[in-house]
């Protein structure tokens, strides 16, 4: 493959692990000697054959060496380097220093082989695909080019990313984790592998065209590739089937490495990649068998029956010496047997055609062995005794495989409903189940069956076959054996295919083998003997290795069956030992399900092994590599190709052209079949070997981990695995049963998701829910850098409860592999239906694993402010002299359904975040402080308040001083705060001037006509609190000035003062105009007058900012500056900010008087940058300054208590410690929100994030001060805030990229609304924007009658270290103030 690297490889010749390990040496000359040679070296490390395989083109794995090879190749373009002998140079010396451990060498080989593979992919994309697309060199159409290269570009992109991750992994465990995290992304290979036969056919056609053949040859010479394009196109097929082998090799040597902790991850990676390979092989197998079936139909002469496809899948085919229906004597003639799910067809070869000689329906099939001929057996028709055929197999393996499959299919197709035990007895006695002698193997696997009875049923027809085998059943527990056998068979008839897979049931298959000493030979010995814990015959194929794994469960004979089983990954449940069984499983799937119930344990055992075996066998052309198991070797081929049966038969099956070619290609072992690929033969054998040796050892060990993985997937894939109802037992059971599994799974999950250990533990049900949500698109897949894991009691309970103890780890592993295979199958089907492209898998993959089943969408605000750990969207509650403050604050929440306890308000600096509810206006844009709909202000310490935009429920500031009245709101009284009630009908006639007065403990809210903010005296003690608040008053018809700015102007500009200076914005006359974002400069903000259509009304919103602790005068004291709408003012820190009243034909001039009080010099930045609210473009204050946002809303909407009023969706200034506050303008329309607080970056969310980050610094000190200020009500409020904090921290976690525009954020309403017990009517709640996963609303807040808020359970896990740190502090503070559970009163 080095050539793939082409010149590239030259750049990094030495890097290739293969070389480095094997001997960096691998002298250039040597490597060059054979371009392929280098590849081989890389591959060689784990398995020598693998390396040689690489040489054969098929051995994409050979690529690994490419790194070094390319250099050689560049220097020496030899077209066909010598044999892959060089591959085994690995012993040559190690590049540097001490000889690395085996584990390290294997890890390096994985990286190096991946590097070489990526170079080859790049060569395909850039050197072949590019010219063909750009120049139309060969005159190929776009469709032809697509057929030729399929989705090779997606694979190249994905592999490049995988390589980058692998190179950044410093340990073997990290490498395994890369595969676990990206396991789902590998499904893109399915499309490629399925298209490969078509690609190969087209390439062969082109090779017959002189111009095309000439161009390809010239191109190969120019690139100095030793292998033709055909070999390169085969590499992805080879590579995907080798990952699990490489990982198995990694697992084999894990003992040398660190402890067992990382082992679980390695095992999960093995299971995941085995499932991928298994699924791909199964799909290929089905495709090949379908092609083979058509070919047989075409060649068959004398057949007058229906199309052969009516008899199910082609399970096995083979050539035997045999006789006709006459007597027991063998006539020496050759008979071709084609075993379908429902019928055995006997034919004779006549040249290239087949002559029909008879058929026997599987329900009437009788099989008996000849005591005189160890290789002979007889098949007859129970209904027509004369219809019998004496056959002689070529070896014991083949005989065992056929007898097992025939018996299994007989029971699966039997019309009678045979009890499982009866079936087992029949199989053992009537059918002379040789497996009888091999029951011991089965006993090992019993647990497997029990864990996943349903799955077994659906997936284990093959398994059942296992059950039929007497031997295995005995070992399992006599009764289970028979039961599983019965059920599987009974069910099998219904689902022939499942049956086949299950037919792979090792138990049955092997038992027959076991009966005859011969069958016990190769595979039986390995499987049975090793069966108990680890069958690790190095000579075995992947399938055998899987069988070994299964052996742990006690399934030994399954080896052959397994091969068959692999044919149907879909039947993953059927880890049938042989492919034949796998195919058979289709008819018997149903019965297998029934049987599964009876014999869960048994089936599980059988099932687990078969699928793995099959998968591995398929992947590694087992035939060549399975010295120990001749039959198995053939079997692997069988699974891969319809020809596989022939293989079993021996030469004939493998010879079947169409299938064999395809299977060979896919299987590597068959590669030789491809003439154009020079090294194909060696390659094929190599892969097989690698698979065998690798799979056996590693797979067995990781069996548990794989099972765990499978559970995870099942959880992830509700559709398939998630359905564990069928496999439910198995999945949950596995978790419970295998402590190791649970451990593995949690660890896997954790690693997979990159969550902390605490997050690591996830029950299957949780995973299932998360996956379902992702699959359904409820949660955005693209994700969260660090998804938050929220475990729910129900999830945990379900998980543990569902689990059923008793299944051995190997069983669970097998089940997992099967489930994973199903998962991949479903996903592929979905992909194919929707699109044939899975390029976007990577991004969504992680999310899916990480995705929490979180009902609540991420809060836009929270997302926006992931960075601000301190400011979690909670207003710090500062009880100045007003005890009412806290209570009031909660009140708005109460009315506001939107309030999610997650209303994030910046707390630090004691400054609350002013929020504009954008319930109506914002379609879910995040509001820093108040949820739009919730119309909730979270009181913050420092007494600063958020303005409540929601009409129905303004949140009073915690500072007693601020009151926001929304006409829609009834009245929310804070302790010590006057309640202002605005008639629901009144369109907020009142100015709602909200003046924050630092006056001690005095606070009054003007009545409707006027809303005054009372400033709680700002004392140095409250550095955070900035007394001033903005309240947004809601105007009926016309949007009021947002903040102090223009009234009615859709665009309000929040002003923050830096250094205590504030810019006043004059509202522009244009009311329809959306709020324009204002840019703020340094300490001063340039006031922008929002254009108001209406002339500025008399209403003025004076902003008074007082730096330091100086209290503001009483309302009267407030400086009100009425400035023409157009006049922009910049104020010094010390200067009060006047807002230009926006004159507006509002029914009432609504004036928001904001007094900015820099609560304390403490606030880190009194001169915090003003936050500008713009349509969403305005940057929010970066500084921790208290920003209060006031949003005006239309009264009508607000009055309904629907928090959806004209709040500027974006309008949400985040208060920062600086004490400056932002005013947000609200949209003229209650629903419409034109103003968005955005960071300088632009979006409100960003602003919030920024504020939070700003707050982060100062927040710690403010909490203490605020704590001091808290009064009794404050404590309750603080409890509420604590809950809110948790939810917001979660949201923050969700949205680390707080910069996202608010609009894009999930709507507040989405999560909170559903939770509010009594959501106010929302006239026009904006549709929530696309949901994003959010952990923000983990805390549920219920609004009870009387405006009481009581947080529901909040089960959250914060995984961000930063979150944990800052969050813990703030949490501690809140908790000190009061329990979050305390009810809140409006």
Curated annotation (Swiss-Prot):
Pfam families, A to Z: RhoGEF, SOS1_NGEF_PH
Keyword Transport set for record: no
Swiss-Prot/TrEMBL keywords: Disease variant, Guanine-nucleotide releasing factor, Intellectual disability, Leukodystrophy, Phosphoprotein, Tumor suppressor
Phosphothreonine, modified sites: 445, 1257
Biased composition (Pro residues): 1318-1330
Family annotation (CDD domains): PH_PLEKHG1_G2_G3 (cd13243), RhoGEF (cd00160)
Positions of region (Disordered): 1-21, 36-82, 436-540, 554-612, 701-739, 790-815, 829-859, 1037-1099, 1162-1191, 1291-1333, 1367-1386
Protein name: Pleckstrin homology domain-containing family G member 2
Protein's organism: Homo sapiens
């Amino acid at each position: 493959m080095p050539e793939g690297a082409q010149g590239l490889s030259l750049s990094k010749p030495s890097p290739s692990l293969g070389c480095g390990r094997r001997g960096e040496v691998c002298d250039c000359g040597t490597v060059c000697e054979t371009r392929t040679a280098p590849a081989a070296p890389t591959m060689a490390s784990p398995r020598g054959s693998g390396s040689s395989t690489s040489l054969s083109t098929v051995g994409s794995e050979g690529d690994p060496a490419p790194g070094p090879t390319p250099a050689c190749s560049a220097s020496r373009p030899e077209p066909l380097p010598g044999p892959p002998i060089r591959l085994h140079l690995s012993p040559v010396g190690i590049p540097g220093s001490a000889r690395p451990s085996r584990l390290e060498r294997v890890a390096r080989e994985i990286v190096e082989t991946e590097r070489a593979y990526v170079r080859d992919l790049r060569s395909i994309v850039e050197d072949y695909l590019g010219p063909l697309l750009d120049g139309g060199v060969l005159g190929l159409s776009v469709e032809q080019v697509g057929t030729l290269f399929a989705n090779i570009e997606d694979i190249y992109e994905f592999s490049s990313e995988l390589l980058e991750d692998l190179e950044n992994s410093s340990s073997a465990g990290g490498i395994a984790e890369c595969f676990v995290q990206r396991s789902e992304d590998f499904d893109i290979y399915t499309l490629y592998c399925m298209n490969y036969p078509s690609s190969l056919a087209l390439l062969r056609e082109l090779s017959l065209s002189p111009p095309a053949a000439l161009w390809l040859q010239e191109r190969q010479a120019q690139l100095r590739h030793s292998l033709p394009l055909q070999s390169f196109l085969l590499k992805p097929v080879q590579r995907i089937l080798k990952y699990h082998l490489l990982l198995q090799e990694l697992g084999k040597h894990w003992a040398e490495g660190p402890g067992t902790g990382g082992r679980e991850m390695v095992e999960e990676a093995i299971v995941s990649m085995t499932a991928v390979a298994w699924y791909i092989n199964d799909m290929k197998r089905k495709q090949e068998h379908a092609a083979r079936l058509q070919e047989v139909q075409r060649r068959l002469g004398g057949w007058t029956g229906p199309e052969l496809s009516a008899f199910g899948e082609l399970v096995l085919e083979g050539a035997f010496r045999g006789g006709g229906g006459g007597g027991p004597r063998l006539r020496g003639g050759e008979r071709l047997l084609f075993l379908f799910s429902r019928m055995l067809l006997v034919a004779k070869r006549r040249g290239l055609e087949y002559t029909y000689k008879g058929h026997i329906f599987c329900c009437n099939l009788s099989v008996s062995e000849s005591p005189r001929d160890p290789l002979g057996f007889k098949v007859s028709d129970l209904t027509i005794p004369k219809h019998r055929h004496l056959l002689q197999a070529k070896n014991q393996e083949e005989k065992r495989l056929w007898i097992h499959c025939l018996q299994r299919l007989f029971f699966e197709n039997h019309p009678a409903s045979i009890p499982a035990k009866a079936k087992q007895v029949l199989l053992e006695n009537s059918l002379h189940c040789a497996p009888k002698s091999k029951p011991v193997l089965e006993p090992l696997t019993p647990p497997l069956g029990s864990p996943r009875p349903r799955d077994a049923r659906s997936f284990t027809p093959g398994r059942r076959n296992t059950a039929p085998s007497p031997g295995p059943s005995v070992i399992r527990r006599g009764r289970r054996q028979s039961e599983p056998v019965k059920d599987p068979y009974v069910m099998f008839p219904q689902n022939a295919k499942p049956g086949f897979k299950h037919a792979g049931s090792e138990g049955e298959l092997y038992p027959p083998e076991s009966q005859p000493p011969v069958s016990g030979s190769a595979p039986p010995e390995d499987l049975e003997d090793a069966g108990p814990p680890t069958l690790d015959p190095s000579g075995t194929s992947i399938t055998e290795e899987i069988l070994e794994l299964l052996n742990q469960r006690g399934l030994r004979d399954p080896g052959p069956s397994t091969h068959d089983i692999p044919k149907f990954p879909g039947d993953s449940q059927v880890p049938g030992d042989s492919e034949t069984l796998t195919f058979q499983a289709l008819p018997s799937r149903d019965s297998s399900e029934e049987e599964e119930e009876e014999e869960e344990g048994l089936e599980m055992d059988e099932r687990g092994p078969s699928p793995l075996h099959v998968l591995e066998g398929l992947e590694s052309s087992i035939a060549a590599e399975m010295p120990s198991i001749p039959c198995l070797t053939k079997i692997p081929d069988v699974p891969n190709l319809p020809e596989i049966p022939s293989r079993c038969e021996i030469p004939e099956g493998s010879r079947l052209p169409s299938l064999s070619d395809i299977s060979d290609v896919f299987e590597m072992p068959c590669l030789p079949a491809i003439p154009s690929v020079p090294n194909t033969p060696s390659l094929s054998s190599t892969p097989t070997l690698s698979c065998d040796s690798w799979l056996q050892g590693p797979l067995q060990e990781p069996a548990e981990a794989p099972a765990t993985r499978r559970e995870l997937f099942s959880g992830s894939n509700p559709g398939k695995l998630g359905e564990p109802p069928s496999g439910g037992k198995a999945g949950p059971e596995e978790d419970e049963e295998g402590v190791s599994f649970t451990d593995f799974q949690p660890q896997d999950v954790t690693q997979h998701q990159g969550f902390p250990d605490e997050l690591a533990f996830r029950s299957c049900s949780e995973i299932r829910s998360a996956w379902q949500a992702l699959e359904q698109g409820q949660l955005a897949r693209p994700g969260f850098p660090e998804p938050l894991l929220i475990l729910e009691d129900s999830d945990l309970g379900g998980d543990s409860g569902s689990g059923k103890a008793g299944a051995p780890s190997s069983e669970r592993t097998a089940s997992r592999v099967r489930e994973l295979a199903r998962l991949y199958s479903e996903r592929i089907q979905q992909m194919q239906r929707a699109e044939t492209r899975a390029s976007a898998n990577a991004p969504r993959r992680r999310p899916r694993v990480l995705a929490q089943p979180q009902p609540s969408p991420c809060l836009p605000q929270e997302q926006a402010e992931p960075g601000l750990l301190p400011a979690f969207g909670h207003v710090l509650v500062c009880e100045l002299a007003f005890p009412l403050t806290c209570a009031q604050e909660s009140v708005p929440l109460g009315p506001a359904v939107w309030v999610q306890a997650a209303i994030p308000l910046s707390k630090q600096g004691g400054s609350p975040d002013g929020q504009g509810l954008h319930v109506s206006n914002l379609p879910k844009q995040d509001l820093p402080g108040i949820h739009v709909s919730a119309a909730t202000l979270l009181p913050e310490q420092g007494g600063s308040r958020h303005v409540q935009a929601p009409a129905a429920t303004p949140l009073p500031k915690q500072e007693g001083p601020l009151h926001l009245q929304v006409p829609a709101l009834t009245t929310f009284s804070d302790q010590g705060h006057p309640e202002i009630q605005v008639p629901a009908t009144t369109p907020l006639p009142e100015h709602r001037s909200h003046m924050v007065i630092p006056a001690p403990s005095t606070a009054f809210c003007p009545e409707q006509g006027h809303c005054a903010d009372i400033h709680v005296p700002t004392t140095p003690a409250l550095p955070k609190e900035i007394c001033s608040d903005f309240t947004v008053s809601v105007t009926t018809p016309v949007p009021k000035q947002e903040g102090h700015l223009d009234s009615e102007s859709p665009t309000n500009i929040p002003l923050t003062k830096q250094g205590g200076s504030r810019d006043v914005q004059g509202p522009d006359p244009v009311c329809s105009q959306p709020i324009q974002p204002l840019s703020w400069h340094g300490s001063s903000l340039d006031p922008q007058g929002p254009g108001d259509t209406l002339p500025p009304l008399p209403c003025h919103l004076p902003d008074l900012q007082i730096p330091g602790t100086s209290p503001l005068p009483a309302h009267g004291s407030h400086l009100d500056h009425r400035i023409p709408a157009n006049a922009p003012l910049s104020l010094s820190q010390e200067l009060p900010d006047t807002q230009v009243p926006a004159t507006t034909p509002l029914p009432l001039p609504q004036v928001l008087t904001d007094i900015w009080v820099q609560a304390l010099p403490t606030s880190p930045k009194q001169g915090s940058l003003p936050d500008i609210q713009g349509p969403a473009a305005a940057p929010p204050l970066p500084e921790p300054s208290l920003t209060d946002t006031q949003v005006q809303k239309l009264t009508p909407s607000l009055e309904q208590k629907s928090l959806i009023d004209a709040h500027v969706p974006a309008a949400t200034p985040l208060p920062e410690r600086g004490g400056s506050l932002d005013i947000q303008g609200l949209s003229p329309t209650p629903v419409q929100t034109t103003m968005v607080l955005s960071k300088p970056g632009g979006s409100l969310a960003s602003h919030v994030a920024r504020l939070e980050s700003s707050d982060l610094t100062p927040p710690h000190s403010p909490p203490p001060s605020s704590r001091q200020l808290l009064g009794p009500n404050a404590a309750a409020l603080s409890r509420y805030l604590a809950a809110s904090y948790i939810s917001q921290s979660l949201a923050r976690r969700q949205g680390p990229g707080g910069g996202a525009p608010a609009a894009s954020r999930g709507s507040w309403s989405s999560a909170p609304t559903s939770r509010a017990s009594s959501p106010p009517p929302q006239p026009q709640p904006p549709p929530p924007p696309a949901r994003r996963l959010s952990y923000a609303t983990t805390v549920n807040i219920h609004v009870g009658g009387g405006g009481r808020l009581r947080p529901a359970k909040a089960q959250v896990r914060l995984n961000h270290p930063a979150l944990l740190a800052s969050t813990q502090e703030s949490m501690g503070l809140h908790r000190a103030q009061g329990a979050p559970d305390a009810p809140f009163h409006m």
